Amino acid sequence: MRTLAILAAILLVALQAQAEPLQARADEVAAAPEQIAADIPEVVVSLAWDESLAPKHPGSRKNMDCYCRIPACIAGERRYGTCIYQGRLWAFCC
């Protein structure tokens, strides 16, 4: 019986020793999103839209998928303007 009590005490001490670093790590992880957000620079995307090239019917824009592409639009897409991203000019294709 005494051996069982000693083994239980050793087990509890070992578990407590592991729990303290886990709690400290959990505190670090909780603070990490604020730190990560401060490290990420802002991304600015600028779009230049040519209204004369826009579809004339309001319903035709409903399901339109548009992308910024380099160097040009792919087959089946039409260039509607220019995107400026990270200092580079991209084609605004729909």
From Swiss-Prot:
GO biological-process terms attached to the record: antibacterial humoral response; antimicrobial humoral immune response mediated by antimicrobial peptide; cellular response to lipopolysaccharide; defense response to fungus; defense response to Gram-negative bacterium; defense response to Gram-positive bacterium; defense response to virus; disruption of plasma membrane integrity in another organism
UniProt keyword Phosphoprotein, yes or no: no
Annotated signal sequence range: 1-19
UniProt keywords, alphabetically: Antibiotic, Antimicrobial, Antiviral defense, Defensin, Disulfide bond, Fungicide, Secreted, Signal
Disulfide bonds: 66-94, 68-83, 73-93
One cellular component term from this protein's GO annotations in UniProt: extracellular space
Main location: secreted
Record's subcellular location: Secreted
Positions of the propeptide segment: 20-38
UniProt keyword annotation of Secreted present: yes
Pfam families, per database record: Defensin_1, Defensin_propep
Domain of life of the native organism: Eukaryota
GO molecular function: protein homodimerization activity
PANTHER family (alphabetical): ALPHA-DEFENSIN 1, NEUTROPHIL DEFENSIN 1-RELATED
Main function: Effector molecule of the innate immune system that acts via antibiotic-like properties against a broad array of infectious agents including bacteria, fungi, and viruses. Possesses the ability to neutralize bacterial toxins such as B.anthracis lethal factor, Clostridium difficile cytotoxin B as well as leukocidin produced by Staphylococcus aureus. Also blocks herpes simplex virus infection by interacting with envelope glycoprotein B and thus preventing its binding to heparan sulfate, the receptor for attachment.
Quaternary structure annotation from Swiss-Prot or TrEMBL: Dimer. (Microbial infection) Interacts with herpes virus 1 HHV-1 envelope glycoprotein B; this interaction inhibits viral infection.
Record family assignment: Belongs to the alpha-defensin family.
Record's protein name: Neutrophil defensin 3
